[in-house]
Amino acid sequence: MAEAYVVEAVRTPVGRRGGGLSGVHPADLGAHVLKELMVRSGVDPAAVEDVVFGCLDAVGPQAGDIARTCWLAAGLPEEVPGVTIDRQCGSSQQAVHFAAQGVLSGTQDLVVAGGVQNMSQIPIAFATRQAAEPLGFTAGPFAGSEGWRARYGDQPVNQFVGAEMIAAKWGISRRDQEEFALRSHQRALRAIDEGRFDRETVAYGPVAVDEGPRRDTSLEKMAGLKPVLDGGTVTAACSSQVSDGAAAMLLASERAVREHGLTPRARVHHLSVRGEDPIRMLSAPIPATAHALKKTGLTIDAIDLVEINEAFAPVVLAWLKETGADPDKVNVNGGAIALGHPLGATGVKLMTTLLHELERTGGRFGLQTMCEGGGQANVTIIERI
């Protein structure tokens, strides 16, 4: 049976909105991790057969197939192509899936997967709102579709509404969310202080550590914030941060490992993606995880570490309730509430952390999942070698 191996993975530190990476062109952010990936892996860049990058809101400096632009901006061989994909927040996790599928199919031997996002420069949903307004489209991407309206009516398609729906359905209180958010910051700060992220990150100029975690946060401070929606429970403190960053990883076939003298660090054990209610939007990791475990024959207890994106605290808390996963195995170094969520880069960012943490702890299986626009969720299971 063919295998897809993870050879190397690296990310930038995640910058806060308006922080140390905010003025960096997205192509240069992506180029930075690509250059480092080639150096760390030792592979001949000309042997790479494709570069698959995730990126949302592909307008302005993020337009024009940024995967290709990042590669060229890195000074790497022109004969290597690139393609940019958009599965919303799961874009670069899907990039890993496409890269792995190319390797598993036998049609490719060396593929780079990654992602980049500068949310300081291009705000979230800019492509669906502000960029469309000069063309007369002012009500979002679903307005005007007869088929959509016939199926879903005029229900709001909004991530904050989805987070509140999850909190209500699974009985998750504001206090539950705030305690989870505080723990995310505490875990992230511990990871930074202990140097757990040092191997997986490459500094960009003076930005050497993740900028998001707050040492001065507390339950008391969180309790003073207004909910995002009137009468709701979700506040900014329980939500992922607006962020800037990039990440990249190299996947290889058995033949490439042999011919290029590479050392595989993990194998892709499973990859899948599922969908559900696009209005609730953010709960798809629950059925997607169940699907993945059934397909592999694994139990949740067989998974040593989990990275589930902390888009909002209710997303992870509902997932924990449904799966019965041990919270001490989940987001052990904090998550997007503390560390940030650079949209199109987050999938590979999380997988980079998962790989390095499996190596640090000696774990075998790591599972990654995340909620995505449209009510979707990717699941990837990697096995440390």
Model-derived features: positions:
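Condensing-enzyme catalytic core mediating Claisen C-C bond formation in acyl metabolism
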Residues: 1-24, 36, 142, 220-283, ...
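N-terminal extracellular/periplasmic Venus flytrap/periplasmic-binding protein-like
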Residues: 11-12, 23-32, 40, 176-259, ...
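Conserved beta-ketoacyl condensing-enzyme motif
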Residues: 22-111, 116-134, 201-209, 279, ...
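Conserved catalytic cysteine-centered active-site region
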Residues: 24, 55-109, 153-159, 216-241, ...
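Short, well-ordered amphipathic alpha-helical segments that serve as non-catalytic structural scaffolds
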Residues: 27-42, 66-70, 95-98, 159-166, ...
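Active-site-proximal alpha-helical scaffold in enzymes
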Residues: 87-117, 167-196, 248-255, 342-361, ...
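Flexible glycine-/small-residue-enriched beta->alpha junction loops
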Residues: 110-165
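Active-site pocket-lining segment
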Residues: 162-164, 200, 204-207, 269-338
